[in-house]
Amino acid sequence: MGKVLDLALHPLELRAALKLKFIRQPLFSTNDTRATPQLERCYELLNLTSRSFAAVIMELHPELRNVIMVFYLILRALDTVEDDMTIDPQLKVKVLREFDSKLDTTDWSFDGNDLKEKDRVVLTEFPCILGEYHKLKPEYQKVIKRITGLMGNGMADYILDENFNLNGVQTVKDYDKYCHYVAGLVGDGLTELIVLAGFGSDDLYHGKNSFQLYESMGLFLQKTNIIRDYAEDLDDGRSFWPKEIWSEYATKLTDFRDPKNTQKGVDCINHLVLNALTHVIDVLTYLSSIHEQSSFQFCAIPQVMAIATLAKVFNNPEVLRKNVKIRKGTTCDLILNSRTLKGCVDIFQYYLRDMKQRLPVEDPNYLKFNIQVAKIEQFIEEMFQDNLPAGVEPRETMIYLKVQERLKWDTQVIPRVQEEDYKFNMALSVVFCVLLSFYFFTK
């Protein structure tokens, strides 16, 4: 009932939800996801573990759909081992370190998870996933195995790191390193897969600054989640906020839960948001380098969700008490409006300006925050250069040329969006006429 009321109070979001549900069509047919019982079961497992990820994976180009589905399930299985506190640490470390080698088998499975672990089925039915993994092109298998090995060993290292287990994340450098292992590596693997498929520019993975770009894609998402999950993580007896930042505002991380320390907690949240915003320019550069439309949407949707979530947690004391989320209708609106690069940039600008407007002058990082937002705004100006005086030619910078290339693909998307708007407006007109007729003839 709450979600329905939310939509009713936000008519533009209601419009977006209806368009997404009834009007918008996927780019590709999904019939081939049921080609065999084994493949169909893998997609069922995907839906069981994450409906949101399943939705975006299902809309991918057939060349990458099964690849990324298998990649996700393998990393989910790895994460399910790492997350389960009932598994003996020695056994857990062994399984994590050897996980990539299990991909060479056809029948390995693991039933050592707690029976209450909701995702244990991914491990008990792992042979099903292995069957689909071995059907992938060798170059795709190689990427998945490499990332699985790096991530498994990274997880094992953190389990054995007594200082981390006792004191949590200490420095901003440690914070970035932790986010690298849990999210940056995913960005690494996905980027290589996209480039191998020919769906992104070659320099996206092999360029001089490519590591920084795909690393930022992962870190921006992970840092957003870490900021948002403060209360939930503390309830679970853990936290990933870096001490280098939070110690500027409190003696203990739990101090922020005391109502008298709320303002200090909010100042810390804003500082962490500022840290996350340092990745935005890289994120926009990365998105400018994706050509194939379904891959673009796959990459863009989580990023626009992240900037919307950052705006939600920004200057928000509720974060200290509970997990805050963006509205369902907002999510629908973001999905529809992030199908073009210009649409994504508009979303980023909207939320950046919203945060800037709400930033209190008394905030300890007021000046730094404004400088960071100004840097991003200036970069966006360089991306498009569409407000130049008459007679002035745009500077052909690297990002400008990337954007011009991406805009060629955007022009193919715009007619599709316009057609959806037309169909929705026609449907709305029909419904309105029917209701009006009903009212007129029954009066």
From Swiss-Prot:
Known EC number: 2.5.1.21
InterPro entries cross-referenced by the UniProt entry: Isoprenoid_synthase_dom_sf, Squ/phyt_synthse, Squal_synth-like, Squalene/phytoene_synthase_CS, Trans_IPPS_euk-type, Trans_IPPS_HH
Membrane topology label: Multi-pass membrane protein
Keyword Glycoprotein recorded: no
Principal location: endoplasmic reticulum
Pathway membership, UniProt: Terpene metabolism; lanosterol biosynthesis; lanosterol from farnesyl diphosphate: step 1/3
Cofactor(s) listed in the protein's UniProt record: Mg(2+)
Entry's Gene Ontology cellular component terms: endoplasmic reticulum membrane
Catalytic activity: 2 (2E,6E)-farnesyl diphosphate + NADPH + H(+) = squalene + 2 diphosphate + NADP(+); 2 (2E,6E)-farnesyl diphosphate + NADH + H(+) = squalene + 2 diphosphate + NAD(+)
Keyword Flavoprotein: no
GO BP terms in the entry: ergosterol biosynthetic process; farnesyl diphosphate metabolic process; isoprenoid biosynthetic process via mevalonate
Keyword terms, alphabetized: Endoplasmic reticulum, Isoprene biosynthesis, Lipid biosynthesis, Lipid metabolism, Magnesium, Membrane, Multifunctional enzyme, NADP, Steroid biosynthesis, Steroid metabolism, Sterol biosynthesis, Sterol metabolism, Transferase, Transmembrane, Transmembrane helix
Classification via Gene3D superfamilies: Farnesyl Diphosphate Synthase
UniProt GO molecular function: squalene synthase [NAD(P)H] activity
Transmembrane segments: 181-201, 294-314
NCBIfam families found in the cross-reference section: squal_synth
PANTHER family: FARNESYL-DIPHOSPHATE FARNESYLTRANSFERASE, SQUALENE SYNTHASE
UniProt function note: Catalyzes the condensation of 2 two farnesyl pyrophosphate moieties to form squalene. It is the first committed enzyme of the sterol biosynthesis pathway. Required for the biosynthesis of ergosterol.
Name of the protein this chain belongs to: Squalene synthase
Organism: Candida glabrata (strain ATCC 2001 / BCRC 20586 / JCM 3761 / NBRC 0622 / NRRL Y-65 / CBS 138)
Gene that specifies this protein: ERG9
